[in-house]
């Protein structure tokens, strides 16, 4: 489950953003047990709900902020400040889908969204 700002979610859905920038990288599936791609649920900030999902095809680690900016829609200066002297991880965004009906966090056993992201168990009735 990934917390994401509304403007970034819209750019992912529009195909304009193919890297989602984070300070840490996911493993394929919880505890590395599932193969890639990794299913990522998108909690959109301010909505109180999961609005959709995308496939994370893998990730890149880089401190070349111009490269990351070109694929993430985030200005290089902002990325450099966010990185704090370290490399960042670009989660490679694959196929994205917006749900017809948003899913409240409570459906996933959560009372609040993660600060950045976290692994969760998906209820059986939510799996495709």
For each feature predicted by the language model, list its residue ranges.
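Structured alpha/beta reader/binder surfaces that contact nucleic acids or chromatin modification marks
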Residues: 1-128
């Amino acid at each position: 489950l990934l917390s994401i700002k509304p403007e970034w979610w819209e750019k992912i859905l529009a195909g304009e953003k193919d890297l989602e920038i984070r300070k840490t990288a996911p493993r394929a599936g919880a505890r590395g047990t599932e193969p890639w791609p990794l299913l990522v649920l998108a909690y959109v900030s301010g909505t109180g709900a999961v609005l959709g999902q995308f496939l994370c095809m893998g990730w890149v680690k880089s401190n070349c902020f111009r490269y990351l900016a070109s694929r993430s829609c985030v200005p290089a200066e902002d990325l450099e400040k966010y990185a704090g002297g370290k490399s960042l991880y670009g989660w490679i965004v694959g196929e994205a889908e917006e749900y017809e009906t948003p899913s409240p966090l409570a459906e996933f056993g959560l009372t609040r969204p993660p600060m950045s992201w976290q692994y969760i168990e998906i209820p059986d009735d939510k799996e495709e």
